[in-house]
Amino acid sequence: RDAGIVNQLRELIEECGAKRTLVDIELTESCFIEDEKSAIDLMRQFKQLGARILLDDFGTGYSSLSQLTRLPIDVIKLDRSFITGIDQNYQSQSLVRSLLGLARAFGFAIVAEGVETEREMQFLKDIGVDYAQGYFYSKPMAPDMFEAWVADKKKLRLIA
């Protein structure tokens, strides 16, 4: 809705010297309800800056599969309601497998939100989900704690 937001992002990227490809813009389905045309135009401008567009909480709101053919998105984030207990829920497994196939057909990556157990993580890994996030990996933390956590993870990768 703020026409200057693209310029603000451009300025921030230049100020910080950030790699444009590291910028992700997460939008929920509700962003497209009032004015889909303007939202699509805004997403294209973000993409021209190198940002990836992520559709957050997919499948929980006003989603229409036809939107996937119109929206310039890169990633679909599956809501945790599909993920919780997926290792034991065959209906959720079928749904997520279907969404994964659909995402592949459109060239989208998939993020599974709300992964809390090793069994959920393993199932998602086995079916080829691209990314996962949730308490299984880490609880929310302050920026300084995050930096220490990342540094520790890098050390573990070097050892392994």
Predicted regions, residues:
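Conserved N-terminal phosphate-binding loop of PLP-dependent enzymes in the Aspartate aminotransferase
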Residues: 95
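Divalent-cation-assisted or electrostatically stabilized phosphate/pyrophosphate-binding catalytic cores
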Residues: 90
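C-terminal helical cap(s) of enzyme catalytic domains, especially alpha/beta-barrels
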Residues: 125, 141-160
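The catalytic core of metal-dependent phosphodiesterases that act on cyclic dinucleotides
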Residues: 1-86, 102, 106-140
